[in-house]
Amino acid sequence: MLSESLTKSKLTDPLILDLLQNIREHRSMLEDLKSIKIDPKLTNIISKEIGRELYIENEFHKAKGFRKLHIEVAEFSKNLKILHCVFFPDPKFDIPIFGMDLVKINDIVSAAIVDLSPASQNQGLKYEKLLSEVDKSSFTSLREIPKWGGIFSNNVFFASLKRKSEKNDFCRVVDQYLTILIKLSKRAKPEVNEEIIQERIDFQKNYCVQQMKNEKTSMVLLKYFDEKWVNNYIKTVLFDF
């Protein structure tokens, strides 16, 4: 067992538990999976102050083809729940960036997004057709991609989930995107050309820079922490490079 169960008894939301289990199962298929040690103060963050209850727990791993596999589960003031996951590829390997976020306010899923984002020029040609074949016809409330969302693939999925059937279908879409990612990672061979590696590094840097333009992330955290802490958390834990 590489790590203890996230959130243990604190996490009871069935949708987040289902997604978490699915992500972990796919993560376990990767070769040379190892945990990454980071500052414990950034791994488990808990506040029991009444009205400002907070629970954040992070998992960090690496594997062959991936420099960082990050899962974050968070609950704010008992009504806002977030599941965030990004698998950053090792730039030596031609693998896309897997990203998934779920935002749940009480029982309403206001945002559910999943993508395999390109990590090199024309990389999407390898998998866009596979993503387009994933059935997404059942969703009724698709959302508009934000202005900074040029980092995403043509088949990024972004929606609000209204019905239980849509929540189940989102789990299926995530599962299928992860399955495609694992297949791509197993086919990928290490690159030796420094220019190609640098291009992939630049793509990941841009991915992180654009993600940091999502003001909603900092707005939530600033209700509980000062600006210095929030900036460090975003740049160190969420979108480092």
Swiss-Prot record:
Species for this entry: Prochlorococcus marinus (strain AS9601)
Keyword Oxidoreductase in annotation: yes
Domain of life assignment: Bacteria
Reactions catalysed: (2R,3Z)-phycocyanobilin + 4 oxidized [2Fe-2S]-[ferredoxin] = biliverdin IXalpha + 4 reduced [2Fe-2S]-[ferredoxin] + 4 H(+)
Coiled-coil parts of chain: none
HAMAP family according to UniProt: Ferredoxin_bilin_red (MF_00618)
Function: Catalyzes the four-electron reduction of biliverdin IX-alpha (2-electron reduction at both the A and D rings); the reaction proceeds via an isolatable 2-electron intermediate, 181,182-dihydrobiliverdin.
Family: Belongs to the HY2 family.
GO aspect biological process, one term: phytochromobilin biosynthetic process
E.C. code: 1.3.7.5
Pfam family, one: Fe_bilin_red
Protein name: Phycocyanobilin:ferredoxin oxidoreductase
Cross-referenced Gene3D superfamilies: 3.40.1500.20
GO terms of molecular function: cobalt ion binding; phycocyanobilin:ferredoxin oxidoreductase activity
